[in-house]
């Protein structure tokens, strides 16, 4: 079993404020605390507007990597943000939140193949979360 620290997520209000204000100390403390608690990976999710996300995700990656030496899990549905962030990660990242939505697959799977990244896949597509196990299995 691998433990993924999930506290660096821009959908959390305080983290969103830290991203917007470029509060590196706050983000770095979250990273260090999770690493010290035994996380094998750190999830980084800018959780911001799509137009800001590439820049914000890059800032998060740089900020976190400057204080911990564990692999990162890049968590974004935005292929543009992932494309930029994957260029600066120091260790092969994991890609989080791949789903069966064609636009995500088309934008993200080439990155996964090129960089040989492990993935976390969500069993859902354009129709949302499947209602039956059979439909779920067709997605994965």
Where are these regions (language model features)?
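Gly-rich Lys/Arg/Thr-decorated short loops/hinges at beta-loop-alpha junctions or inter-strand turns
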Residues: 9-16, 36-45, 120-128
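Conserved anion-binding
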Residues: 101-140
């Amino acid at each position: 079993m691998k433990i993924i620290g999930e506290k660096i997520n821009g959908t959390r209000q305080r983290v969103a404020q830290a991203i917007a204000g470029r509060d590196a100390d706050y983000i770095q403390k979250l990273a260090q605390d999770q690493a010290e608690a035994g996380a094998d990976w750190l999830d980084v999710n800018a959780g911001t507007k799509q137009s800001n996300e590439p820049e914000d995700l890059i800032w998060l990656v740089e900020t976190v990597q400057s204080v911990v030496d564990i692999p990162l899990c890049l968590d974004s549905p935005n292929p543009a943000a992932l494309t930029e962030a994957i260029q600066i990660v120091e260790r092969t990242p994991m890609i989080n939140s791949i789903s069966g939505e064609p636009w995500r697959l088309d934008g993200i799977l080439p990155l996964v193949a090129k960089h040989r990244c492990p993935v976390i896949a969500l069993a859902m597509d354009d129709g949302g979360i499947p209602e039956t196990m059979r439909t779920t299995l067709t997605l994965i």
